[in-house]
Amino acid sequence: PIGCADCHDAETMNLTITRPALIEAYERMGKDITQASHQEMRSLVCAQCHVEYYFDKNIEEGSQYLVFPWDNGFTAEEMEKYYDDIEFSDWTHALSRAPMIKAQHPGYETYLTGIHANRGVSCADCHMPYISEGGQKFTNHKMTSPLEYVSSSCQVCHREETEELIQSIYRNQDRVMETRLILERLLVRAHVEAKTAWDLGATEEQMEEILVGIRHAQWRWDYAVAAHGASFHSPLEISRLMGTAIAIAQETRLNLSRVLSELGLNEEVPYPDISTKEKAQEFIGLPMEQMHEEKEEFLKTVVPRWEEIAAEREAAWDVDVNMGSE
């Protein structure tokens, strides 16, 4: 669970950074995070977790060291170059054999490319707006969608009616989703066509550029999709990113068609029926029965132990659990 000490100094209650990965990422970029303004800190405390990251197994022996891949910059392309330069991949795709990167949740990075960040608006301004109670003004620590309290988040700056503000956000989401669905169809076809090429005897040399294209196109898709709220935070950047992914995916499929032709296939690649989740799982060979059993075992054994440890820890806290209750 997230507590006060994750974001606040225990003595002064000033905002503070407690995650080494964020401090180290700033240092590698030649920046001193201790010089950040209070307004910047109202977003940086969020950036301790709501970011893209990976675990480096080579920094400390026997451990997976948390790293933010910002050495080249905050954009998807700059992080892609970082991963390419160190030849990092999270997994190899079972169909295409492409070395894939799994985006985490680059919320802070996509926020930086949006209009609100450009205007100096922080994460807390919208997600933790000021409220008053008992004659005191303080930030709302119910961190959720600003649409739950439009009057104290959006309408501090915007004068439109509540419903119009909400609908404008939904319209952006719908438009981004249109592009996302087009890209997803192209990515699936690229993976299937790559598998067909391998099955027909394609060589590593023939597939090298193709696998890079699949990797880059899907990274952009995953980056856009995993950045929860990105269609609001930065709709133009997310649309641009998926547009470049569509171009890369199509160019990759064009290269694939040439390879397939060289291998003797001059017709459309047979496409599987993946119209349902179950059919897609079956096509890629997921052992769903085994996975369901493993999840049930996890819920029966691991989760109760977590809850037990949490209860033991909280029982030792010297606090009045009824403080503030009516």
Which residue ranges define each predicted feature?
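Extended, compositionally biased alpha-helical segments that mediate assembly or anchoring
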Residues: 311-326
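Primarily the internal scaffold of c-type cytochrome electron-transfer domains
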Residues: 1-125, 129-302
